[in-house]
Amino acid sequence: MKLDVIGAGAFGAGLAIAYARAGLDVTLWARDVAGLRGGESPRLPGHAFPDGLHVTGDLSACTADVALIAIPTQSIAGFVAKGGLAPRVAVSCAKGIDRSSGHGPTALLAALAPCTAQLTGPSFAADIARGLPTALTIACADAAEGAALQNALSTPTLRLYTTQDVIGAELGGALKNVIAIAAGAVIGKGLGDSARAALIARGFAEMTRYATAKGALPETLTGLSGLGDLILTCGSAQSRNFRFGHALATGDRLPEGTTVEGLHTARQLAASPEDTPIADTVAALADGTLDIDGALSHLLSRPLKPE
């Protein structure tokens, strides 16, 4: 099977490496091919591209029916507008909400391909590239297309589960980033694992409230794309969102160019009428209207209520 992977950041490179090793005919498109020095992505150091993986900066070389779009959510609309790619199926690998339109990734990709899907779930690029066991969700409104993608994109170490709840899968991946920022801040401030556990539980309740209000199914949020991804990113410094929250609490900075999707999502939620106290606090903390002590006080001073 031919497969195009658009975007040579950490996740795109990880997927391209995994699928090339699994025997697929993979073409990896990079915006800056010259930056891929030494046969690897600078965003995923130590993981060399296998023989047979085609790397290009020319979109016209990407002719597969299925394209995995592994670019940040905030870059998707601009990429689609430029044209040059016309797959039959465009699979988003981004986890966010577009700040200009408020749309999820698959809605942005609808102008690119007649069929869209969302690949999401608990996964770090390095684990995928190393061939470590990973389970993901492939969400597609068309059940037959979803099943076909599941069969085509599952490997001995990468297991895919299907759902038709695209909204739930997209929002699970986007919202958990916000909670991961908060979890990073909790650990960076030295508040302990008990506080982090409480945050994860209340954060999951916040995710579920928001997502179901937008039409998601509750059971989707309890699956890989919601709870599974939340547990992973709130518990590991491999998560960029977790590291960002940690840096907010300690006064450190992340490397220039680090993508933090959860920051944009937090701002979207803070501007919405939904009850999202954790997202509101993360947005205020990131924007400097609250410091870490003020953020903690803000959350702990909320009215007591039943769980």
UniProtKB/Swiss-Prot annotation:
What InterPro entries does the database record attribute to this sequence? Answer: 6-PGluconate_DH-like_C_sf, 6PGD_dom2, G3P_DH_NAD-dep, G3P_DH_NAD-dep_C, G3P_DH_NAD-dep_N, NAD(P)-bd_dom_sf
Tell me which SUPFAM superfamilies the record gives.
6-phosphogluconate dehydrogenase C-terminal domain-like, NAD(P)-binding Rossmann-fold domains
Picking any one GO molecular function of the record gives:
NAD binding
Q: Tell me the GO BP annotations in alphabetical order.
A: carbohydrate metabolic process; glycerol-3-phosphate biosynthetic process; glycerol-3-phosphate catabolic process; glycerophospholipid metabolic process; phospholipid biosynthetic process
| Residue sites binding NADPH per the record | 11, 31, 95, 125, 240, 261
Reaction(s) the record says it catalyses: sn-glycerol 3-phosphate + NAD(+) = dihydroxyacetone phosphate + NADH + H(+); sn-glycerol 3-phosphate + NADP(+) = dihydroxyacetone phosphate + NADPH + H(+)
Using the UniProt record, name the top-level EC class of this enzyme in a single word. oxidoreductase
Stated family: Belongs to the NAD-dependent glycerol-3-phosphate dehydrogenase family.
The record describes the protein's role as: Catalyzes the reduction of the glycolytic intermediate dihydroxyacetone phosphate (DHAP) to sn-glycerol 3-phosphate (G3P), the key precursor for phospholipid synthesis.
User: Any idea what this protein is called?
Assistant: Glycerol-3-phosphate dehydrogenase [NAD(P)+]
